[in-house]
């Protein structure tokens, strides 16, 4: 049975006709294992992958060989020859993408993160540069459809049946707060309730006090490595609200339920005030938002800070803790769960990511839609094909231990920190197809993964992130213009310049209240439009 439509579908979307970075393979040059059959030159498919530093793609040390093996296997199985050309990009990905699209260059697939912060879905949807995959996935890649059907696919489909990109299917529960445990205990604090001789850090007040004591031990001017968006993912937001500056939620405004930017709501004033106080006191850096990922990692590894939340996904925190341990064998680490505002508070929670944290879009001008869908149908036809495209050649680049875990071949343990292959040709991760756990995790690391990051009770309830909304040109202009003053006010707080709770020039409202009220009044019509879509899609999902 075909997927449930969100609205009556008026006309079928026609697939583009077949037609005519950095190269990751030699076109049609390899001999396959199938009797030495030589694969002919294939149809070229160009992939752009990247995003902000935490989402950047890194080419593996054996990347070209893995991609060639995948191209060969696909040719053996189907008789179709493809040559992938991949540009592994970082924060400049969107600039390069815009330039290439404007120049008419071939770009077929774009892979990046979704939702806000110049997410892939917002950019391509807003600029009408994506190919609507609503029918193509179901009709031409049924194996892919089976792997993404339900909430993941719904979250990348608008109320008008526009599927912007292929969604990842990954656990939405993956955050934590990495702390130098030895510094924590030396400062007189603990995360262990049984250590009654030390102060238990389960709230923001004691966390702040711990950080200031850490500064005395390290001699550094701040204790936490992390930008404002990282703080709101795991530290400051959940103690006060369900959505912050970088997210939206359902709130009550003048008696009406509205989907609103969390950064303009009454509750957010306490979040922003906390971040301002931390910048002033030295809990966080006043330049936190400009710290690059590599620089932030280096600072923590060198012992200059005691808390690390820059890209606070648990796998990244474990990677950083291991690198820090290698440099300082005496250092110990722990991962904290979400913190309350005070000892007597109850509210807490990390932000939950959508299952579709990442997406792969096909550009509107691509002439390779058929070829891409056929390839993905093959990738998602079996766990073996998916694992080849995700991990590399089994027995060469990774080992399946048969117990739900994987490891690396003897002598290739370095692949744990310097991967052989990026996993690029699944386009996005899909844990429904394969969800192997690295066998090299310690018991403590597994505790962090399963009991801290993986505990659904540690997360804010906010389903707005699971919906994809459309905007009109008029509303985009209104929202863009209205955001300027609100953003300036937020930056002044993040950098410790202006207290958001100080009295504004009107003598009646705080600085925050004045900016937030003005923003809300200007975007009210926009919020109502988004809220209508939210209610429609929620009703259709049942």
Describe each model-derived feature in a short phrase.
Residues 10, 18-542:
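Extracytoplasmic/secretory soluble proteins
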Residues 1-16:
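Sec-dependent bacterial lipoprotein signal peptides
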């Amino acid at each position: 049975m075909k997927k449930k439509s969100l609205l009556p579908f008026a006309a079928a979307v026609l697939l583009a006709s077949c037609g005519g970075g950095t190269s990751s393979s030699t076109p049609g040059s390899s001999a396959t294992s199938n009797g030495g059959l030589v694969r002919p030159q294939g149809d070229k498919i160009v992939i752009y992958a990247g995003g902000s530093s935490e989402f950047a793609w890194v080419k593996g040390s054996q990347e070209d060989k893995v991609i060639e093996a995948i191209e060969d296997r696909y040719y053996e199985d189907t008789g179709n020859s493809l040559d992938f050309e991949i540009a592994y990009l970082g924060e400049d990905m969107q600039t390069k993408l815009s330039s290439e699209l404007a120049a008419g260059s071939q770009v077929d697939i774009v892979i990046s993160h979704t939702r806000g912060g110049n997410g892939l879905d917002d950019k391509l949807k807003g600029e009408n540069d994506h190919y609507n995959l609503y029918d193509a996935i179901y009709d031409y890649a049924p194996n892919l459809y089976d792997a993404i059907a339900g909430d993941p696919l719904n979250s990348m489909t608008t109320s008008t049946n526009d599927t912007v990109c292929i969604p990842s299917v990954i656990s939405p529960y993956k955050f934590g707060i990495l702390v130098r445990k030895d510094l924590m205990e030396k400062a007189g604090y603990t995360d262990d309730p049984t250590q009654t001789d030390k102060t238990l850090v389960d709230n923001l007040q004691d966390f702040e006090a711990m950080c200031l004591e850490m500064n005395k031990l390290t001699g550094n001017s701040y204790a936490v490595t992390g930008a404002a968006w990282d703080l709101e993912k795991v530290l400051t937001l959940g103690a006060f609200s369900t959505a912050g500056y970088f997210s939206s939620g359902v709130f009550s405004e003048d008696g009406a339920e509205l989907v609103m930017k969390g950064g303009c709501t009454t509750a957010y004033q306490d979040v922003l005030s906390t971040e301002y106080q931390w910048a002033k006191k030295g809990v966080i850096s006043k330049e936190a938002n400009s710290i690059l990922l590599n620089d932030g990692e280096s600072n923590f590894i060198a012992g200059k800070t005691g808390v690390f939340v820059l890209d606070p996904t648990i796998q990244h925190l474990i990677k950083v803790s291991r690198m820090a341990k290698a440099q300082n064998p005496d250092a110990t680490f722990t991962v904290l769960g979400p913190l309350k505002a005070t000892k007597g508070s109850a509210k807490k929670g990390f932000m939950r990511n959508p299952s579709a944290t990442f997406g792969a879009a096909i550009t509107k001008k691509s002439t390779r839609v058929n070829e891409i869908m056929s390839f993905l149908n093959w990738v998602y036809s079996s766990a073996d094909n998916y694992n080849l495209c995700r991990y590399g050649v089994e027995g060469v680049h990774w080992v399946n231990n048969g117990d739900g875990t994987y490891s690396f071949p003897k002598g290739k343990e370095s692949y744990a920190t310097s991967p052989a292959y990026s996993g690029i040709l699944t386009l996005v991760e899909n844990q429904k197809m394969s969800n192997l756990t690295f066998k090299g995790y310690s018991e403590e690391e597994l505790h962090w993964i399963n009991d801290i990051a993986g505990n659904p009770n540690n997360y804010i309830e906010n389903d707005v992130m699971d919906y994809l909304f459309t905007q009109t040109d008029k509303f985009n202009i209104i929202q863009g213009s209205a955001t300027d003053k609100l953003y300036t006010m937020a930056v002044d707080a993040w950098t410790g310049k202006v207290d958001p709770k100080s009295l504004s020039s009107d003598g009646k409202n705080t600085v925050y209240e004045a900016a937030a009220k003005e923003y809300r009044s200007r975007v009210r019509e926009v919020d109502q439009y988004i809220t209508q879509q939210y209610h429609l899609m929620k009703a259709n999902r049942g």
